[in-house]
């Protein structure tokens, strides 16, 4: 509840309580402002930017890191901004694309790529390192 209060105070003080007014701010100014709000980290800031403000920012979460590290595409220790940069430089900078891609990652993470993997039936299982391609 404290984090929500901090965000609400920011929204009232900086944007007159208007999400629409906040969303009109340029991304280059808005992201650092959100990160300065106590309790808002990179993932939460990017969630707000993508889903509430329709800004083309890719949201990285635990599912993203887990799926892509298990498939040998990134190191488990990759930092948030580096992983985000990989997506943003390789996907079309489009809000709809980022929302859909992130949603598919969340779905895959919740259903298959959990802390304890449930690889049976996962659509990405054939892409795991060491799994021979099927004909």
Question: What residue ranges belong to the model's regions?
Answer:
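Catalytic cores of DNA base-excision repair glycosylases
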Residues: 1-135
């Amino acid at each position: 509840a404290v984090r929500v209060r901090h965000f609400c105070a920011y929204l009232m003080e900086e944007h007159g309580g208007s999400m629409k007014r906040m969303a009109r701010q340029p991304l280059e100014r808005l992201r650092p402002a959100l990160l300065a709000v106590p309790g808002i980290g990179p993932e939460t800031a990017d969630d707000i930017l993508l889903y509430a403000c329709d800004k083309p920012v890719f949201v990285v979460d635990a599912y993203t890191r887990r799926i892509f590290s298990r498939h040998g595409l990134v190191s488990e220790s990759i930092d948030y901004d580096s992983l985000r940069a990989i997506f943003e430089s390789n996907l079309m900078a489009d809000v709809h694309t980022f929302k859909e891609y992130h949603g598919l990652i969340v779905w895959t993470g919740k259903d298959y790529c959990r802390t304890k993997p449930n690889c049976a039936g996962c659509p990405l299982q054939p892409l795991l390192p060491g799994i021979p391609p099927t004909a």
